[in-house]
Amino acid sequence: MSVTRADREASLKKRYAGRVAAAPKRRGMGRGPGPGAPRGGGRPKSTGAALKRLMSYLEADRLRMGIAFFCVIVNTVATLTGSYMLRPIINRFIAPPDGSPGNVAGLFKGLTMMACVYLLGVIANYLQSRLMLEVAQSALVRIRTDLFTKMQKLPVRFYDTNSNGDLMSRFTNDVDTIGNMLSSTLVQLFSGTLSIIGTLFLMLYTNIWLTAVTLIMIPLMLRAGGEVAKRSQKYFSAQQSALGALNGYIEETITGQKVVKVFCHEEIAEEEFDILNRDLREKQIRAQFLGGMMGPVMNNLSQVNYSLTACIGGILCVVKNFDVGGLTVFLNFSRQFSRPINEISMQVSNVFSALAGAERVFSVMDEEPEAADDKDAVSMDGMRGEVVLDHVTFGYNPDKIILKDISLYARPGQKIAFVGSTGAGKTTITNLINRFYDIQSGTIAIDGVDICHIKRDDLRRHIAMVLQDTHLFTGTVMENIRYGRLDATDEEVVQAAKMASAHSFIMRLPKGYDTVLESDGANLSQGQRQLLNIARAAVSKAPILILDEATSSVDTRTEKHIEQGMDRLMAERTTFVIAHRLSTVRNANAIMVLENGEIIERGDHEDLLKEKGRYYRLYTGMAELN
């Protein structure tokens, strides 16, 4: 049955629902909790709370902000003073009310003074712009730091249920939107308010009746602005949500580009991208259209107001109840009075975009961090590597149990293997040993101490992992290996590489250990990346080792090479092996066969073959394929 565009659109909406708060990854039972209900998308925080919290990041720069806002006051006063100076210049030197001739020398002197006043305003405006830019960037540094620091404290569960692309969108798009508001919008709101107050005072001083005419339109302008702001807020939140969904899809597609090409999924990917892209376009149009309506509406009302004021002012001049200089200045003030109102109204879209972005950033900051260590948690130095699981029961969701009554005992230096079908719970067990998740019942103990009573850093410092999905950081080969133990010497790094059988290929690289790796080690083969991962585990000197299908993604020849490194790595370490190829676990001290979250068989290779149970069928089936 063919899949229609409507079907794909429905699928995308389901997959990316609630992207504003979370973006579930599709992961199996053995790899993580899998898709969960969207969190927080339908209950955004209040605008006032987001604004108050955002302003707290400016408190450290109160002095610079104070100077900047003082400069705003100077600029506003200079602008208003310069504008009002036109009245005496016109009435005294250009068109005196008594009909006497003008005065060129006086005109030149008056214009020079007015230019000096405006120059003072220009200097103040430059200082204000520079200072607010520094304040905004300092605030962004603090926001990014808090966001990144918080993300280091979040549990693995958070990353299992959130899209990398959406999280990156919060770091980039949302934070940049906040920066734009802090650097310019705040000042424009303050200067606009100040201009309105100052202009209104001078308008009243110039002519109270024309001021009354000008103010007639203000309630209508405020009502229009409030209505547009009210309607546009929800659309700006939807826009940020759609942007996060699109970024998440792009990140997933680029990361999985090989899979896309292998399954000839290019056209489908383009179609799904088009659906998300068009959805973003529609939401952006709605948000930007409503936000952009503010300017034209205000301008039209301002033009009507200007025309009405000019007509009435002209009549007053004709009947000699007003002077030409006063009318000129007042018309200029009426423009200045409506301009900040227009500017403030046009900043509404920026404000709501920034607040929507702030809500998304703060939603990550407000996530529950990894549970703190118990008060009686102990430090463990020199672990021997004795691991005991006693009647462990666990589920990523309490109502869906994955591991049922798991018990096992590993003596220091033993090799324990887990085999079973995909989704049986093999990786979940290793996640629990690392305490990436807390169990529902039972105990996990290392060297006789419940891991809940061991400080997390100490626990994980004594456990090294080599995963199927290798990950290398941008940097030198030396730095990537040393990531396993930052205080390792160069000699220890080289020794670890030799133990992992990686030294020979490293020395063939252009700069040896100083060769800079591209993102995720893209300039190395899969096997070479895995050897560096093994070297990283070796340099850590951890007494407990976890190998999660470490050779399943390489060819047989490379696998033999990697196995040599792993054999040396496993010596004198308690090792837990998740096996894809059963030939790699034949020499394990104990093999645990898992099915549906339960250990259905256990024993060494020979004993399990004699039982002719599940392991026997798996092994002989593999042998026949080979």
Model regions: which residues?
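Helix-loop junctions and hydrophobic alpha-helical segments within the transmembrane domains
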Residues: 58, 147, 151, 260, ...
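ABC-type nucleotide-binding domain
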Residues: 366, 373-374, 378-626
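Transmembrane helix-loop-helix hairpins at lipid-water interfaces of multipass membrane proteins
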Residues: 47, 65-127, 204-209, 320-324
